[in-house]
Amino acid sequence: MRMVKPMLMKPLLLAPLLLAAVPAQAALYITVVQGLGGAADYQQQFDEQSKVISAAAKTLTSDDKLTEFSGDAATRAALLAHFAQLNQNMGEDDRAALYLIGHGSFDGEEYKFNLPGPDMTAQDIKSLLDALPGRNHFVLNTSSTSGAMVELITGVPAPRDDAEAPADSSTDKYLLVAATRNGNERNATHFGRYFAEALSSEDADINKNNNISVQEAYDYAALQVEAYFTDAGSLATEHSQLRGSGAAQFSLSRLNAIELAPDADPLIAQLLEERQALDTQVEELQLRRSELGNTEYLRQLQELILRTAELTERIEAAQGTSGAGQ
C-alpha cells in the first residue's frame, strides 16, 4: 500500500538526474505489541488502540518495516528474536518506535509488561533498545506502573506521589513516554486510548503541518486524561511523563495521507513518494541539529530545501502532462 501526502506545486520540468543526488532515506522501524488484556473490555480497548496505531504507522513507513504482535504470538521469545533481527537490519541513521499496549505490574523492585508466558521486564526492554544502532528510539508504554520502566531505562529515580518528573537524563538514545509517573500508579490507565486518538486528530496537530509528533500526541493525550478525571469529579490516578529529547521532531503519523488509485500515473506516484521521503529527511536532520552543529545543520537543511523545491516543480509538471493526456 502506497501512502502519500497531497501537495500543491508549481510547474517546471527539471532533469531526472536531480534525484540521483538525494541520499538514501533513513528508515523507521515500528513494532506494535499488544499484551494480555485479561477482562474482555480491556481486550477490546487494546485491540482498538493497536489497530489505530498500526494504521497511523502505515502513513509513515512501509509494510515490511511495521511488525505487530498480539495474542499468543506476543511472547517474550518472539520479541527478543524480532529485535535481534532489527539489530541486524537497522543502520546508524535509522530509528525504531516500540508501542507497548497492555497491562503492567511493579513489585517495588521490578517492572513487568504482561505477555503470554514469561513477561517482559524493564531490563529486557532496556537491553533491546541498547542493542539497536543509532539513537532517538521511541517507546510508548501505556500500562499501569509504566513509570517504573522509565526509571530503570534512564537511570534516574522515578518521582513519587505528587512530585514533579525529574529532568531528562543525559542520554539522547531514548525518547520515552509512559502513562504513569512511577510504579505506584497501579490502576488501569486511560492515556493509551487518547494517545492513539491523537495520531489521527487534527486537533492534536498544533503546528498544522499535517504530521503528529511525539510531543503533539503526548500533549493531546495528557490534556484529555486531565479532562476525563475533572469531568468525573475524581482524583487523577495516573500522571503521564515524557522523557528524552527530540519529541517535537519525531513524527508518529501523517494526516491527510491518501492512497493512490490503482490506475494512478506511476511516475507521479514515484515522485510523490520521493517528495515525502525528503520531508522525512528534514525531520531526521532536525533530530541531529545539536550533534551536527549549527553551521553543518544549516548547510544540510538548505540542500534539502532546494531539492524539495526542485522535486516539487517536477511533480507539478508531471501532473500537468498527465492531465493534458486524459
Predicted features by range, described:
Residues 10-21:
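Bacterial N-terminal signal peptides
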Residues 22-26:
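Sec/Tat signal peptide C-region and signal peptidase I cleavage site
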Residues 37-53:
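Glycine- and acidic-residue-enriched helix-capping/strand-helix junction motifs
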Residues 52-94, 294:
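Functional beta-strand-loop-alpha-helix junction segments that form "active/interaction loops"
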Residues 307-325:
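Amphipathic alpha-helical coiled-coil segments
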